[in-house]
A protein has these predicted regions:
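Outer membrane beta-barrel
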Residues: 1-73, 79-99, 117-120, 125-127, ...
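Detector for outer-membrane/organellar transmembrane beta-barrel domains
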Residues: 93-214
Length: 214
């Protein structure tokens, strides 16, 4: 930490992706994360990260950026036709009504029953260059280009946007996810199933209420 506003880190950890992925599994509203999260999240990776946090005239601002290897946990070999790619990720969050009680913007239910409305709106953009896995940091390895195949080196752009509102026990949460690519997402190998990058869009919405007696 440089001061109360700046922080840098190096190693393997969660990327600054969609909020539901970053929230701990013990602090979710429901028993499991959504299908949208499972398909489009950017999970963990190895690299550098930087954080900036500040409050300006009562409005909270959180900025995060990361440069990572793009292969996720337990990365596969970096040699061969798919070597050399990196993942570049940035996230911004604005809290127009100020900070949540007890860091409540990163647990889903309003268990602390906010006395005034609290809102956090965030967006992440991530570019994964020369992906090796079907979901970037997750999934099985893609087949590599060869002289006898039409397989391409695949790079993707992922947009993740979310919003969390809490007030007096009520918690409303929504997410939008999109992943696209200019490359052919399908890779092939003789006599085995195709492997392809998951592209497309997804939306999730959820709500909960914590009674005062809880």
């Amino acid at each position: 930490n440089f001061d109360n506003n700046w922080q840098i880190g190096f190693g393997q950890t969660k990327l600054p992706g969609n909020r539901q992925r970053v929230v701990s599994s013990s602090e979710m509203q429901f028993a499991e994360r959504s299908v949208v999260n499972n398909t489009f999240n950017i999970d963990r990776d190895f690299g550098f990260q930087g954080w900036y946090r500040n409050t300006i005239e009562g409005v909270g601002l959180n900025l995060r950026a990361a440069i990572s290897n793009g292969d996720g946990r337990n990365p596969i070999s970096t040699s061969g036709a798919r070597a050399g790619g990196f993942c570049y990720t940035g996230r911004a969050e604005i809290l127009p009504f100020g900070a949540f009680t007890g860091g409540g913007d990163y647990f889903e239910g309003d268990v602390l029953r906010e006395k005034t409305p609290k809102l956090s709106v965030g967006a992440t953009y991530s570019v994964n260059s020369r992906m090796r896995r079907t979901m970037g940091q997750l999934g099985p390895e893609l087949y590599t280009p060869t002289a006898n195949s039409n397989n391409q080196l695949i790079s993707t752009n992922t947009l993740l946007a979310d919003a969390l509102l809490k007030y007096s026990g009520l918690a409303l949460y929504g997410e939008y996810a999109m992943r696209d690519s200019k490359n052919n997402p399908v890779t092939k190998s003789a006599n085995v199933d195709d492997r392809f990058v998951f592209l497309g869009t997804g939306i999730l919405a959820q709500a909960s209420y914590c009674f005062p007696s809880m």
